[in-house]
Curated annotation (Swiss-Prot):
Family statement: Belongs to the methyltransferase superfamily. RsmC family.
Name of this protein: Ribosomal RNA small subunit methyltransferase C
Gene label: rsmC
Keywords: Cytoplasm, Methyltransferase, rRNA processing, S-adenosyl-L-methionine, Transferase
Any Pfam family matching the protein: MTS_N
UniProt cross-references to InterPro entries, sorted A to Z: DNA_methylase_N6_adenine_CS, Mtase_sm_N, rRNA_ssu_MeTfrase_C, RsmC/RlmG, SAM-dependent_MTases_sf, Small_mtfrase_dom
Organism: Pseudomonas putida (strain ATCC 47054 / DSM 6125 / CFBP 8728 / NCIMB 11950 / KT2440)
UniProt xrefs under Gene3D superfamilies: Vaccinia Virus protein VP39 (3.40.50.150)
CDD domains the UniProt entry points to: AdoMet_MTases
GO molecular function, one term: 16S rRNA (guanine(1207)-N(2))-methyltransferase activity
Organism classification: Bacteria, Pseudomonadati, Pseudomonadota, Gammaproteobacteria, Pseudomonadales
One Gene Ontology term, aspect cellular component: cytoplasm
Cited function: Specifically methylates the guanine in position 1207 of 16S rRNA in the 30S particle.
Assembly information from the UniProt record: Monomer.
């Protein structure tokens, strides 16, 4: 069980009524708290929670409409995302209790100061390198629309400026990361057909593909509901059409793809997790059509080339700069 869940269960008597658990991990916490509902923005966690606790978990960027008497937020990595989530929860809890739980190395002590906007926070427990905080909502805020927190910026690309809309919690929020910047220089000569932007984030790569290859069908895929929402906003801001889907890794992707393009993720919260990226490399052949291509950027220290060669039988390094490599491989 997640150590943060264990800290909650040390105070289980506080959580016996209708409770919303925001950012709920995919463990047995719902099984221990029978009146609780979960809210998650991670498609993999949602799939596991729904399979074990059918009808008790909500996936999306907005809190479920169902009533709750109190709520607990599992602290996310992004401080801006935490602020949005705390505001969304506090706006529904006037005079009632809001809890915040997180790991010390995830910044729980600093994040707890964000509770001061709603009342007088107090620390209830500290165990398993985690802390649990509580505040009674004396000053319930107005709920802020998610789009009001969007960061909008423009990228100067070869074929004209691209408008990017990013949301709190999305990878490289509000700026272009170095890996994607390098990959954007290597989008020439791609095979047309059905293209996939895997781990799409704010949709920079997918939007660029659709603009550069307008006759191709472009699908954007991410595990995170906020990334899915941001990608849709980015496409709309540029007058582009594309299919944006949520799913847990490459298994959720279409097959018979002409292209997989990716700056694959390797962080889950504050933890490093290479599973999604390694699955992408190992299973790429299942999703590419014959002659289809995979092109991706990754940190130079990651040993991805043997995995790509094992799946597709070939792999070349197109470029290396600034600590990143561009890999290219074709399904024979």
């Amino acid at each position: 069980m997640d150590p943060r869940s264990e800290v909650l269960l040390r105070q289980a008597e506080l959580f016996q009524g209708p409770l919303l658990i925001a950012g709920a991990p995919a463990d047995d916490l719902l099984g221990q708290l029978p009146q609780a509902q979960a809210w998650t923005w991670h498609a993999g966690d949602q799939a596991m929670l729904e399979s074990r606790f059918a009808g008790r978990s909500h996936y999306g960027v907005e809190a479920p409409e169902a009533a709750f008497d109190s709520a607990v937020l599992f602290l996310p990595k992004s401080r801006e995302l935490a602020a949005y989530l705390l505001n969304a929860l506090a706006s529904r809890l006037a005079g009632r209790e809001l809890y915040l739980v997180g790991e010390k190395r995830g910044g729980i002590e600093g994040a707890a100061k964000q509770l001061q906007a709603f009342g007088k926070p107090r620390k209830l427990d500290s165990a398993r390198h985690c802390q649990l905080w509580q505040v009674t909502i004396d000053q319930a805020p107005q709920a802020k629309p998610l789009e009001s927190l969007a960061e909008r910026f423009e990228l100067a690309l070869e074929d004209g400026p691209l408008q990017v809309v990013s949301l709190p919690g999305v990878f490289s929020h509000g700026r272009l990361d170095r890996g994607t910047a390098l990959l954007l220089k290597h989008l020439d000569g791609l095979p047309g057909g059905h293209m996939l932007d895997f781990g799409c984030g704010a949709g920079v790569l997918g939007a660029t593909l659709k603009r550069r290859y307008p006759q191709s069908r472009v699908t954007l895929l991410d595990v995170d509901a906020f990334a899915v929402a941001a990608s849709r906003l980015t496409l709309a801001a540029n007058g582009l059409e594309g299919e944006v889907i949520s799913g847990d890794g490459i298994d959720a992707a279409p097959t018979e793809l002409s292209l997989i393009l990716s700056n694959p993720p390797f962080h889950t919260g504050v933890h490093t997790n290479y599973q999604a990226s390694e699955n992408l490399l190992k299973k790429s052949a299942v999703h590419l059509r014959k002659g289809g291509e995979m092109r991706l950027v990754a940190n130079s220290f990651l040993r991805y080339q043997p995995l790509i060669e094992g799946a597709l039988g070939n792999c070349q390094v197109r470029d290396e700069a600034d600590g990143f490599r561009i890999y290219q491989a074709t399904r024979g």
